[in-house]
Amino acid sequence: MAREFSLAKTRNIGIMAHVDAGKTTTTERILYYTGKIHKIGETHEGASQMDWMEQEQERGITITSAATTAQWNGHRVNIIDTPGHVDFTIEVQRSLRVLDGAVTVLDSQSGVEPQTETVWRQATEYGVPRIVFANKMDKIGADFLYSVSTLHDRLQANAHPIQLPIGAEDDFRGIIDLIKMKAEIYTNDLGTDILEEDIPAEYVDQANEYREKLIEAVAETDEDLMMKYLEGEEITNDELKAAIRRATINVEFFPVLCGSAFKNKGVQLMLDAVIDYLPSPLDIPAIKGINPDTGEEETRPASDEAPFAALAFKIMTDPFVGRLTFIRVYSGILQSGSYVMNTSKGKRERIGRILQMHANSRQEIEQVYAGDIAAAIGLKDTTTGDSLTDEKAKVILESIEVPEPVIQLMVEPKTKADQDKMAIGLQKLAEEDPTFRVETNPETGETVISGMGELHLDVLVDRLKREHKVEANVGAPQVSYRETFRAATQARGFFKRQSGGKGQFGDVWIEFTPNEEGKGFEFENAIVGGVVPREFIPAVEKGLEESMANGVLAGYPMVDIKAKLYDGSYHDVDSSETAFKIAASLALKEAAKTAQPTILEPMMLVTITVPEENLGDVMGHVTARRGRVDGMEAHGNTQIVRAYVPLAEMFGYATTLRSATQGRGTFMMVFDHYEDVPKSVQEEIIKKNSGEA
């Protein structure tokens, strides 16, 4: 089958937003207007097309990024619907990694909200061009220009309206296009009948003012346009659109649109903007990777003629076809039935069938081309972030960074008979979601699961029950603490046992220094002259890794430490890998005496929104929970407080806030960084873990 849409007519976009901004409804409307669905499903009725997991339909939130393909004005638009809840950050991150552009949906009453900030920051890190859709213009309190101001104040974004609303709340009836300088008036409930007419007289001054501001803002990113603007020459609509497109693709400018997806207004114009201003695969730089054989950097251009290269960005288990691997093809063509190389794992894989996904229905296709997104069946060893390439032109693409889990709980099956079933179910869920970890406590034999938050683990335990038919008892949530060293030190690990039979001998000197936050454990071999033979060096590193997994203070994993092996000795007969592993672990224990070991705890960025009269209560809550206020902002009669608070102190906060504000206060929290635990709290943790408390 020949290529249906050229690369220039392909768009890979994500829809991202804060939870409840109306993102899934917006995606639904896109599917409706592009002819993919015939009846609109409402999120609050639990019938949405993109939210296809049972829990998503019950909770009215999007958990997994469903990928779907639609068509608009002769273009193919691949859409990934991403979750807005902070516990599902990895879903947002991995979709951003494979997108070319995104639509950020705002609730026009609230403007930029905490999760909007998180996904905006991630999109900026990945260099993803964005347009902004101020949704819910029909809602009480909707304020388009306030929403635009929050883009400037909270995100420092160079964002400017290319549209203005006509009316607001119940009176929202149309949109002014600041490029064409025309009004689009909606005349029916489905938003399919639109009248284009002159701008109503009462809006003409405002429209002229904002068109002038738009031209000025765009001209600042474009020298030719700036010259014309300064010389007072007329700027044509085509010139303005071309300049907006260039600036948007270069992530220098963010066009802002408005509408109400629920009331079917503004979605078609937003689709036009996706085509007009967001990039095709040809507009973005060729993807870079490393050739595993030479270690050299290579690029793969968006072209069907280039060798095949793709990134696996999501694994899902489908009840009918089994394991699906979602891939973004960057270059070349992939045929069903062909073999590819998983360069991340160094394994050859066979592509069984290729499916084009539409929410939860699918169409089988023979091949997938550069710039497209599809799901492959038959890949056994491929996991999230793996590169798949032509066997003759191998390259490893940049992977997807996975954040560390911050919360954990103990799970056990309700019946002993379910033990094996639970293990298999948890393993399958962990394959789909890299931020979900499953471990067995070596001392107690208990199964411990870790993730990004309480909702994240709730949903996974729920899926265990629904999809794998395992009823589980769940323990209370626990914080995922870490340990580290705060001072540099040198330590010797000496292990010798020579009583009867073969002896054991290992002797190492290791220098330990604190590493930068987030860099993890780094091992350096600085042995000169073979005082520790080369074959025992890996055993020293492994010995350190194994003992660091259980910490030196309270049994928590150790992070961000550099270890340099610089001296030691060995015995011709008695030295072994085991002896050097033990010697390394003894060196770590010895180092702990002088390296100022400390426990680290996850700090959450908490955003609390409360009525003005409850501000004092909230400040008290933050202080009582060992938190510190980072900033405050007034919005009408409500106050928004941003604070850093340890996760350990946030359990049960929802109840406290609810009773203090009679249910009118809300809060959101997102993991921000790890920080040293105060000494007094540290002592309590150590006591508790040693069984004294």
From Swiss-Prot:
Annotated GTP binding lies at 17-24, 81-85, 135-138
Q: Where is the tr-type G domain?
A: 8-282
Transmembrane feature ranges: none
| GO CC terms | cytoplasm
Keywords (alphabetical) are: Cytoplasm, Elongation factor, GTP-binding, Nucleotide-binding, Protein biosynthesis
Q: Where in the cell is it found?
A: Cytoplasm
Q: Name one GO biological process term.
A: ribosome disassembly
Q: Specify whether Transcription regulation is a keyword of the entry.
A: no
Q: Which InterPro entries match?
A: EFG_II, EFG_III, EFG_III/V, EFG_IV, EFG_V, EFG_V-like, EFTu-like_2, G_TR_CS
A GO molecular-function term, please? GTPase activity
Task: Please state which protein family the record places this protein in.
Answer: Belongs to the TRAFAC class translation factor GTPase superfamily. Classic translation factor GTPase family. EF-G/EF-2 subfamily.
Q: What does this protein do?
A: Catalyzes the GTP-dependent ribosomal translocation step during translation elongation. During this step, the ribosome changes from the pre-translocational (PRE) to the post-translocational (POST) state as the newly formed A-site-bound peptidyl-tRNA and P-site-bound deacylated tRNA move to the P and E sites, respectively. Catalyzes the coordinated movement of the two tRNA molecules, the mRNA and conformational changes in the ribosome.
Q: Which PANTHER family match?
A: RIBOSOME-RELEASING FACTOR 2, MITOCHONDRIAL (PTHR43261:SF1), TRANSLATION ELONGATION FACTOR G-RELATED (PTHR43261)
> Can you say what this protein is called?
Elongation factor G
